[in-house]
Amino acid sequence: MSLKRHSLRRNACHLETRAGIPTILYSDATGQRGMDKNIGEQLNRAYEAFRQACMDRDSAVRELQQKQTENYEQRIREQQEQLSFQQNLIDRLKSQLLLVDSSRDNSYGYVPLLEDSDRRKNNLTLDEPHDKVKLGTLRDKQSKVRRQEVSSGKESAKGLNIPLHHERDNIEKTFWDLKEEFHRICLLAKAQKDHLSKLNIPDIATDTQCSVPIQCTDKTEKQEALFKPQAKDDINRGMSCVTAVTPRGLGRDEEDTSFESLSKFNVKFPPMDNDSIFLHSTPEAPSILAPATPETVCQDRFNMEVRDNPGNFVKTEETLFEIQGIDPITSAIQNLKTTDKTNPSNLRATCLPAGDHNVFYVNTFPLQDPPDAPFPSLDSPGKAVRGPQQPFWKPFLNQDTDLVVPSDSDSELLKPLVCEFCQELFPPSITSRGDFLRHLNTHFNGET
């Protein structure tokens, strides 16, 4: 009996769950219920209300957060638009200020600020060429967008016939962009011009050390004038009145560039006139022009006849002197004396006795030597050639005597000339000094 009571007590109190609301049932051994069912239902309804309130609260919080985020995003967008507008305005004002300053000061360090604004907008750095290409493409896209906006604004204005403020802003912005670009191009062109002017070396007429060749000293003033800077400029211009002196061994096609090409190499030129005594060893003697007389007029004609018929020279001379009644020996002595007293250097001058000058006289001294002579004649006119003085070979025993300078004594004039090669006599009465020299030249030419 006691065991039965104990089991009933243990099972009398248990927990029963109904729709999430715990219901406690009490029973005793007699079977009485501990709690009414109405209290359980009230508790269940209260719990349901509380749960619904919690759900409403969570949804309200979520809606509030969503509205706040949307509001924040809208405000952020508006602030960003305002910042971009202010930045564009600042860039435009700065560009205008720089344009004014550059026009006043002509400064070359101008950098357009449009690139800086684009860099700040797109977060680009111009450290690499790829970044520069990127920035250029972005600027092209922006310019295209601006053009499209301007065109669309124009179409809308045409449709509505109402001037829009937005169109004016776009036009002004495009205008200032073009102005900045043109200004940048002008500054870049000026900088390139200055750089090219520094690189380009002007052509300065450099006086190259050159001297006139020794064999071309007949007209030294004319030849030396070719090497002056003005003459060089005339030659380079292609003037036909001046002919350039070219080095030997060059063709006609290289005459224009031969003188300039020599300045590029290390060429040793002959010494200048002011650097060496070599070119001034012999003073230049002015040539004395004889007056035009009947004797000088017939001189060339007689020389041609003497060259053609040298054997008839003595006969012609004797015949002419016999016609006039003059002794040939006395006339020769008088001619030599008169020549020595008047002009010893001019040995070819014809000196005839006083008398009738209308008669045809013959010059007994030839004008010039034959062209086949290997050495210049000693009685040639005094043409000074600049160069080292070389002693002439003298075929006489006495080396101190010179044939060029005649002696004043009559004994030396009457002394016959003797050839040292063939021992042939040349008396002064029938032969002249030119005949003796021509005879010596035949020995050098190998004729005898």
From Swiss-Prot:
Disulfide bonds: none annotated. The modification Phosphothreonine is found at residue 246. Adapter protein involved in I-kappa-B-kinase (IKK) regulation which constitutively binds TBK1 and IKBKE playing a role in antiviral innate immunity. Acts as a regulator of TRAF function by maintaining them in a latent state. Blocks TRAF2 binding to LMP1 and inhibits LMP1-mediated NF-kappa-B activation. Negatively regulates NF-kappaB signaling and cell survival upon DNA damage. It holds the Pfam family TBD. Zn(2+) binds at residues 419, 422, 439, 443. This is TRAF family member-associated NF-kappa-B activator. Residues 60-98 form a coiled coil. Keywords: Coiled coil, Cytoplasm, DNA damage, Metal-binding, Phosphoprotein, Zinc, Zinc-finger. PANTHER family: TRAF FAMILY MEMBER-ASSOCIATED NF-KAPPA-B ACTIVATOR. Transmembrane segments: none annotated. A zinc finger (UBZ1-type) spans 416-443. Heart, brain, spleen, lung, liver, skeletal muscle, kidney and testis. Residues 35-65 are annotated as: Necessary for interaction with ZC3H12A. The gene is Tank. Its main location: cytoplasm. GO terms for biological process: cellular response to interleukin-1; cellular response to ionizing radiation; cellular response to tumor necrosis factor; DNA damage response; negative regulation of canonical NF-kappaB signal transduction; negative regulation of tumor necrosis factor-mediated signaling pathway; positive regulation of protein deubiquitination; positive regulation of type I interferon production.
